[in-house]
Amino acid sequence: MNTSPDYAQPGPNQFHHGAPSIYSSSSSNGVGGEVPITAQLLRGPPPPPPPPPTATATAATAAATTTTAAPSATGEPKQSGPTVPAACLACRSKHLKCDGGNPCARCQASESICQYVASRRGYKGPRRNGTQNPNKRHAAASDDGSPNSNGSNESCPMLLGAGVATPAAPSLSAFNPGLGIPETPMSTIGATPSYSGLQIYRQPYLDANGALVDINPRKAPQTIAERCIDSFYFHFFPGHPSVLPKDYLLRIAEQRNIEHLLAAMRWAGSLYFEVGPTRATFFEEAMRLMYAKDVPKDGFLVQAMLIVLVGLDGSCQQERARDILSDAERIAIEIGLFQRSFAAIHGQGIPVIEESWRRTWWDLFVVDGMVAGVHRQTNFLLFDIVADAGLPCEEHQYLAGTIPRPLYLDDFDNDIFSGEEYEFSSFAYRVASIRNLGRMMRLPESVFPGDNNVDRVENFLSNWRMHLPASKRDCLNKDMKLDEMMFQAWMINHACSIMLHQPLSQLDSSPARDVTSCAPYQMVRSGDTFNTHTRHIVTAAAEISKMVTYAVPITCHTHFFTCVLTLSSIVHLSKWALWFVQNDDDLRQQIRLNIGALNKLSTVWSAASRASGQVKGVAQEIFRSKKAAQQNNASFWVGFTQEEIISSMAADETIMSEINTMLEPVTTSG
């Protein structure tokens, strides 16, 4: 049998768009058989036996036969054969007589498909008054001899499928171009004026094998595991998009065992909604499968470890996350995931899989840099690996499976000088941003104002910002939706600017010394004036706070945004602790933005809950000390009227009340 698609005929799925098509085959296997249910309904009960023929009747019959055989010369209507209750669609479309057979003689001779549909002639619709008249006769007995007690219009023989067996399911063979049907989309056939009022099929109907099939089956409710996979793709995947898109991944899962990856995805997805003790079960299963003796060391294992370590890091299990990160790095280097040839060798000739391997390496690269940068406990091991894996493409291309030819780091670094006009993806700019963080982490520990090494790294940061194309200068894509890869790229750039310049700034960090949820406290001595390094960190901290204002669910960002917000808050708090601060209200609003974002993130990540508590506590302490100093200093109130003093104190009380409200415990989902 030729299995290639015939684009001249509609596919089987088209017959199930909306109401099923009225054009169904008289027999699902193409051979004449059981009378269609439409013909059964239209024929009704068998007629009574005719009376014995008389001479008059015999003569009339002979005359009718003669009249039928010879054309009428007067143009009067010709006498036809016995009246039949319906004509098939083929005869109707050609305006020919039909003998009502199944199949009828014409269709049998032309080898056409003989189909019937109920006529609405004589049908006056349902009664307006639902009360039955007891003096009227009820419906005739059903075919099996039992009376029909259903008085509703569902029992009306004008509606197909009422109280009788239903026809076979529509199939591709049921479509007959010879029926003269206009070339309209199949989805509109059921809505044509001639048949729009008919109940064509009742559910369930019979399939080709005679089995009952529900044409509108109710979708079974999702299991917790399935909901967790969907949650993973909605919340976690946009921030770390290395695994295959869902449809591709499920196909791979049918071909080989990737249960360890699915287990890791289920656990990560369970972090975003309440699943009870199932979450711990998912985690134990993921750990057991990842470290099973027979698990293959391949890219799928690296992906599973990457997901788990990110989840653990956001759940305040940083040491355990670092252990898994070390294992993932070792396996990635052993299998050559960083090499250009890896994607081609292990991609099975499928561009989406090849792209997934490239993304796996670079996402591991970014995560390694973020862990090293925000926690300052590791040294960004993968930064020293000479990698030539292709750079990832845009997110919409990856999800659609339209993978372009990959570009490489050499193309990115030499873009301006080569004369080539390349368009790099947001993921590529994210990689470039984390490389600048790696350069900063390779600086000597002791730096001093005017150090050329600091200036060199700042040149990288500034060049990254200045040479962004117009479409990448904010975190929105061309559809005005959040571009999470550019969001992270900007986030890393601002965080790197703070980490680079804070040791040389003149902003005393001691007021925020208790904010240690992400990294240990680093003392910065204050100075008499704000130097250029202080300006860098104040600007970067304000830009990070501005990133909170994007109208997207903040829990869809990577959890590393928690530590970047904390870094920004330390700068804000250090500046707010000064005696006189310009734009004091703007600064307080930025602190409130950061605390609000940390509160939202804490519903998923316990690390955010810890950071939020520390930032709130420091903000409360600074506010109290500033308030006490102001009230105890009599000269402070010189020039204020009594009304202004009372108004100022009332405003302070309002701020204090807001901070206390923020200090209320946040219930986390884990």
Curated annotation (Swiss-Prot):
Per UniProt, the ranges with Pro residues bias are 44-54
**From what superkingdom does this record's organism come?**
Eukaryota
- The residue ranges marked as DNA-binding region are 88-114
One of the record's GO cellular component terms: nucleus
Q: Please state the biotechnological applications recorded for this protein.
A: Iso-A82775C is a precursor for the biosynthesis of the anticancer natural products chloropestolides A to E via a Diesls-Alder reaction with maldoxin. In the absence of the prenyltransferase iacE, siccayne accumulates instead of iso-A82775C and can also be condensed with maldoxin to produce chloropestolides H to K, which show also antibacterial and anticancer properties.
Identify a single GO molecular function assigned to this protein: DNA binding
Question: Cross-referenced CDD domains, in alphabetical order?
Answer: fungal_TF_MHR (cd12148), GAL4 (cd00067)
A Pfam family found in this protein is Zn_clus
SMART domains in the cross-refs: GAL4 (SM00066)
PANTHER family associated with the record: ZN(II)2CYS6 TRANSCRIPTION FACTOR (EUROFUNG), ZN(II)2CYS6 TRANSCRIPTION FACTOR (EUROFUNG)-RELATED
Does the record's keyword annotation contain Signal?
no
Q: What does this protein do?
A: Transcription factor; part of the gene cluster that mediates the biosynthesis of iso-A82775C, a enylepoxycyclohexane and biosynthetic precursor of the chloropestolide anticancer natural products.
Q: Which UniProt keywords apply?
A: DNA-binding, Metal-binding, Nucleus, Transcription, Transcription regulation, Zinc
Task: List all Low complexity biased stretches.
Answer: 55-74, 142-155
A Gene Ontology biological process noted in the UniProt record is:
DNA-templated transcription
State what protein this is by name: C6 finger domain transcription factor iacK
Q: Where is this region: Disordered?
A: 1-84, 122-157
> Where in the cell does this protein reside?
Nucleus
